[in-house]
Amino acid sequence: MGLWDVDKIEYVGRAKGPKEDFAFHYYDADKVVAGKKMKDWLRFGVAWWHTFNQELVDPFGTGTAHRPYYKYTDPMDQALAKVDYAFELFQKLGVEYFCFHDRDIAPEGDTLRETNANLDKVVDKIEENMKSTGVKLLWNTSSLFTNPRFVSGAATSPFADIYAYAGGQLKKSLEIGKRLGAENYVFWGGREGYENLWNTEMKRETDHIAKFFHMCADYAKEIGFEAQFLIEPKPKEPTLHQYDFDAATAIEFLRNHDLTDVFKLNLEGNHANLAGHTYQHEIRVARESGFLGSLDANQGDKLIGWDMDEFPTDLYETVAVMWEVLQAGSIGPHGGLNFDAKPRRTSFYEEDLFRSHIAGMDTYAAGLLVADKMNQDGFIQDLMAERYSSYDSGIGKDIDEGNVTLADLEAYSLDKPQSELIAATKSDHLESVKATINNYIIDALSEVE
């Protein structure tokens, strides 16, 4: 059976009934949906930090997780052992990608030189496993937020020595990405923001991080690292206010600092909620602006105001996400769905690592099937066409084509009575729209055998 006491997870469809929990009911990797295999639409990835390092602690209690590699007490021995466990889990789940922070995979030494040596040993083993299994690196990144040195940020730190250290750490991380063939490279600024504006030079800090990003882009070009760079927005936590607040803020930052040719966005569901948005909103903003890069698949609890990193089980949300992906044609140029999620503290058995990923993978596969059915029927397209039909001719067409002035609009409107203006509006029938989406969910999934 291997290192994990779990068999390879297979697709069974709906034939074995809803209670079969160690199998995929909807994720059929090679099933063709909208012209591509399901696995190529979804491109699932496993997050190293939550899956192999998360001990399931919370602010009120110690970890509950049972993990087989805890028998290795030496940090380096455990780090090397995790590589074997990780790649067996990838294969048993049928997941073709993974993601990690540099400090996830190897323990830190006292100096950057010592830490880099530790990284090299683990990366050697990861590279061997990648070659033998065919599993690929969706993206890597650098942890510039966990160590106390980054208490006031990394590339926005008021302390130049810390900024310099962060640059050295990034250099090594980019080299690892190049070596392992990472398809993307993510920047998440957990400490890049402020706690209080009274002691913060905001423009200076954002200029500093822009310079940092330009240095990273220059070095990637120098070493031939062609991964897509991604910024991951989050409004807060751990910092009171983070500079990459949401998709719109991050895009504006990129435009202001001449970084639009280098970066796209990696968007996360729970981060969208913390910013007061739906996940679909953030994806729509990025998609329509040309900045959709990759997705972190998780969800938050709508009643709790912090980052829960739950595995995605909200089918309505995954339908919305996959609808946006279908309109885009892919999850960015090289993106995927990375499960930036952890089992609940009460789901602490080894097998729960598999159960949780199965739940997330099936929920996104189901979302894809429903979104595809809606897309084939043209339901949303027809809805949009009808709602905006007044712009197909007359004054509306002139507005769309930029052929009118304010004076033209005034002349058109001056003598129109209120009754005519009210008559020009139409009901959205919004409740029926939502009910129809529910019907599509039921109908599309009932067709799965």
From Swiss-Prot:
Q: Listed GO molecular functions?
A: magnesium ion binding; xylose isomerase activity
Active site per the UniProt annotation: H101, D104
HAMAP family per the UniProt record, alphabetical? Xylose_isom_A
What keywords would UniProt list here?
Answer: Carbohydrate metabolism, Cytoplasm, Isomerase, Magnesium, Metal-binding, Xylose metabolism
Disulfide-bonded cysteines: none
| Localization | Cytoplasm
Per UniProt, the cofactor note for this protein states: Binds 2 magnesium ions per subunit.
> Sorted alphabetically, which PANTHER family does this protein's record hold?
PTHR48408, XYLOSE ISOMERASE
Q: What is its EC number?
A: 5.3.1.5
Subunit comment: Homotetramer.
Positions of Mg(2+) 1 binding:
E232, E268, D296, D340
| Catalysis performed (reactions) | alpha-D-xylose = alpha-D-xylulofuranose
Highest taxon in the source lineage: Bacteria
- Which protein are we looking at? Xylose isomerase
Lineage here is: Bacteria, Bacillati, Actinomycetota, Actinomycetes, Bifidobacteriales
Q: Which positions bind Mg(2+) 2?
A: E268, H271, D307, D309
Cofactor(s) recorded for this entry are: Mg(2+)
Native organism: Bifidobacterium longum (strain DJO10A)
Q: Gene encoding it? A: xylA
Q: An example Gene Ontology cellular component term from the record?
A: cytoplasm
- Which family, according to the similarity comment? Belongs to the xylose isomerase family.
Question: GO biological process annotations for this chain's record?
Answer: D-xylose metabolic process
